């Protein structure tokens, strides 16, 4: 018996298929929403997502703003990169900081990674979505990153309280997406769901997408804590007694708040060298994210509470 498989994009390469699918998702999401927004974390996935969105609506301006939920604890290089992107004429960037966190001085040292993430990121995101009335938010999450993200749909319905219920997910057959929602509900849309980390890097190489320099190896001051290399990025970093930062050749596979982001030893200083490194690696991309190591604050639990 011969099985016939319909190819929606005959003659396209793997990356071209991914690109075409993502652009279709972005356009459909905008068509089905009243007030969309794109979450912008300054990382490589956000940079690829922004690049795809521009392709989707070129030569027009983006029909939605970018939203950066700021924790005040990102790397200095990330803020410099964000400000450079925000200065581009076709973009509108909203920066939101949870005022409760500012007032209480929430930080990863005194309050721990779980509370820091819950207050700054989860509650901050919900505040921003409510304040601006956004009914659909694009995110750069991919299914290969983490098991709870692997089972989330491309169009993910959130309750009026921004909660995710895995049991209420809708079928998405033949790339047919359903963005309908009840009053008060919103939708999170993930156009990069089917991309892998290697796909992202190969696309960055093909499209010459600029990135935060932290993704490339350089001598940086780090301390090792529980097997994780933490970069000393500013004078807020609290060193343990006798702890002395050492200059090591490292880079980051994933970026977040600098006291909670682990670097990896690397000599990859260019995109082709990073791609080569990706072809040989056997470790998880998010192994350096300290927030993922907190069993009481698993990714699925955070997503159910309203996290990205």
From Swiss-Prot:
GO terms for molecular function: ATP binding; sulfate adenylyltransferase (ATP) activity. Its EC number is 2.7.7.4. Residues 286-308 are annotated as: Disordered. Keywords: ATP-binding, Nucleotide-binding, Nucleotidyltransferase, Transferase. SUPFAM superfamilies: Adenine nucleotide alpha hydrolases-like. Pfam families: PAPS_reduct. Gene3D superfamilies: HUPs. InterPro entries: PAPS_reduct_dom (IPR002500), Rossmann-like_a/b/a_fold (IPR014729), SO4_adenylTrfase_ssu (IPR011784), Sulfate_adenylyltrnsfr_sub2 (IPR050128). It catalyses: sulfate + ATP + H(+) = adenosine 5'-phosphosulfate + diphosphate. Belongs to the PAPS reductase family. CysD subfamily. Heterodimer composed of CysD, the smaller subunit, and CysN. With CysN forms the ATP sulfurylase (ATPS) that catalyzes the adenylation of sulfate producing adenosine 5'-phosphosulfate (APS) and diphosphate, the first enzymatic step in sulfur assimilation pathway. APS synthesis involves the formation of a high-energy phosphoric-sulfuric acid anhydride bond driven by GTP hydrolysis by CysN coupled to ATP hydrolysis by CysD. HAMAP family: Sulf_adenylyltr_sub2. This is Sulfate adenylyltransferase subunit 2. It comes from Nocardia farcinica (strain IFM 10152).
